């Protein structure tokens, strides 16, 4: 018997059953417990959601910026008021420790919504005189109905990252959460309605890519798609969006990000950063710094510091406040991570710790993979080249700065990068040469609301967060005004 009742679609400000009658199970990855049967949307449901969104968007866009901002700020207050309950639901669905979801997931999502509610007034056009009797002005107009597809690792945070700028700019959004972790996106829809968002302005369609995701990307009345997920899927989404109606797209995709530890680095600080860049959220973070470059002479000392810190990881029940490391999000994903680990062993990487599924006691019921560190890695190894999206750190050695930069950039990805050094001149010199969209110096992982987030190369297109993203949910209209009598040449 599932813990929760059946979860329906959210269309037009209320819950409705899927027209096709199909459902899928959502499972707690820490225990294997079935949490709920979720209705699976299809193309017919999408058409209903689009009709609802079009009607709601006209009302929403007609409100003043101040009126829209007040509603969004009421949603912020409700999110913060219900932080603990939402965090517990997120933990049950994702397996992430409650200590994380309470302090990060809802908090940072609400921060982004508050940010866009505050800066929406910045959508101002320009007025430019052309001559004494003529000028033009520009205005930013909402796109209309936009679509978004979320990832499974930060379900409610990603939903808010995508909804906040879209709604602040006057659009309606149809959001498809990951079929693995759809529960909190539905709660977010409830909160938006309670806050006063017009019906249809935020619709949620759970379901898989084949039944509703593809239909969303190719629907002719959806003006933009924002997608977070793997690069291979991102290519398909982009192709579908462009071939159907030349939709604008934002893509936040995969990464294999480098963390460069410089020869003058504080090794304790560097080890702390490397641990957070690899084992936070059990390694299921797109920006993880999984390729850790350390000077050859410091390898042994650095390995010792990493191993000491692995001993401090508290693996267990995600609902236990002491837990700092939970399971993989699903059995299928756990298997993919374990296959990469076995490939690392087969290709000659030296296993320092972990490298196996955890089966002790209650952990056997869940999808737990031990924190894993490989040393003596080379650039051609599969674990160094491919995104694993799990708790697997690859340690590589280098001899000089130029070598480190060249090898760090030798990837098709370009999402994130980091440098650890007390010499800020060196830090900036290295960062400016690294081919990545998000870079950190002597820290890792923070993405505040005003900071644009996105990748180079095959790690993405466009940006999430920041002022430019608000503008990306609008189109610019140019209007020329002639004050004097128009002079025709005919």
From Swiss-Prot:
Annotated NAD(+) binding sites: 150-152, 176-179, 230-233, 254, 286, 387
Pathway: Amine and polyamine biosynthesis; betaine biosynthesis via choline pathway; betaine from betaine aldehyde: step 1/1
Protein's name in the database: Betaine aldehyde dehydrogenase
Biological classification of the source: Bacteria, Pseudomonadati, Pseudomonadota, Gammaproteobacteria, Lysobacterales
Pfam families (alphabetical): Aldedh
Subunit structure: Dimer of dimers.
Modification Cysteine sulfenic acid (-SOH) occurs at: 286
Active site: 162 (charge relay system), 252 (proton acceptor), 286 (nucleophile), 464 (charge relay system)
InterPro entries: Ald_DH/histidinol_DH (IPR016161), Ald_DH_C (IPR016163), Ald_DH_CS_CYS (IPR016160), Ald_DH_CS_GLU (IPR029510), Ald_DH_N (IPR016162), Aldehyde_DH_dom (IPR015590), BADH (IPR011264)
Species per Swiss-Prot/TrEMBL record: Xanthomonas campestris pv. campestris (strain B100)
């Amino acid at each position: 018997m599932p813990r929760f009742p059946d979860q329906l679609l959210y269309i037009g400000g209320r819950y409705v059953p899927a027209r096709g009658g199909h459902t899928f199970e959502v499972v707690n990855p820490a225990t294997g417990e079935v949490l709920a049967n979720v209705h699976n949307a299809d193309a017919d449901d999408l058409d209903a959601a689009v009709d609802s969104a079009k009607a709601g968007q006209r009302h929403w866009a007609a409100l003043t910026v101040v009126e829209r901002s007040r509603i969004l700020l009421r949603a912020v207050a409700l999110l913060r008021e219900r932080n603990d309950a939402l965090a517990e639901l997120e933990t049950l669905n994702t397996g992430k420790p409650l200590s994380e979801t309470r302090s990060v997931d809802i908090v940072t999502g609400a921060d982004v919504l508050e940010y866009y509610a505050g800066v929406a007034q910045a959508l101002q056009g320009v007025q430019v005189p052309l001559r004494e009797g003529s000028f033009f002005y520009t205005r930013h107009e909402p796109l209309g109905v936009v679509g978004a597809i979320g990832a499974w690792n930060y379900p409610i945070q990603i939903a808010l990252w995508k909804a906040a700028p879209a709604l602040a700019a006057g659009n309606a959004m149809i959001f498809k959460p990951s079929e693995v972790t759809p529960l909190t996106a539905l709660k977010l829809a409830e909160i938006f309605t309670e806050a006063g968002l017009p019906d249809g302005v935020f619709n949620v369609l759970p379901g898989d890519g084949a039944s509703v995701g593809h239909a969303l990307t190719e629907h002719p009345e959806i003006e933009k798609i924002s997608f977070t997920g793997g690069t291979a899927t991102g290519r398909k989404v982009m192709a579908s969006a462009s071939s159907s109606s030349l939709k604008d797209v934002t893509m936040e995709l995969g990464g294999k990000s480098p963390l460069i530890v410089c020869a003058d680095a504080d090794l304790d600080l560097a080890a702390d950063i490397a641990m957070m860049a690899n084992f936070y959220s059990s390694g299921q973070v797109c920006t993880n710094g999984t390729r850790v470059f350390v000077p050859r002479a410091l390898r042994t000392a650095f390995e010792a510091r990493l191993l000491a810190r692995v001993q401090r990881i508290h693996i267990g029940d995600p609902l236990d406040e002491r837990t700092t490391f939970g399971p993989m999000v699903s059995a299928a994903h756990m298997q993919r991570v374990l296959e990469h680990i076995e490939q690392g062993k087969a290709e000659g990487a030296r296993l320092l710790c972990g490298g196996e599924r955890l089966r002790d006691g209650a952990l056997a019921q869940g999808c737990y993979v031990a924190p894993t560190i490989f040393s003596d890695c080379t650039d051609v190894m599969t674990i160094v080249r491919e995104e694993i999206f799990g708790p697997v750190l690859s340690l590589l050695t280098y001899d000089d700065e130029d070598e480190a930069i060249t090898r760090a950039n030798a990837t098709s990805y370009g999402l994130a990068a980091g440098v650890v050094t007390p010499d800020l001149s060196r830090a900036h010199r290295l960062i400016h040469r690294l081919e990545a969209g998000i870079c950190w110096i002597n820290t890792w992982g923070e993405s505040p609301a005003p900071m644009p987030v996105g990748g180079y190369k095959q790690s993405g297109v466009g940006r999430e967060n920041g002022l430019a993203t608000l503008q990306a949910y609008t189109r610019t209209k140019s209007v020329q005004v002639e004050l004097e009598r128009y002079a025709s040449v005919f």
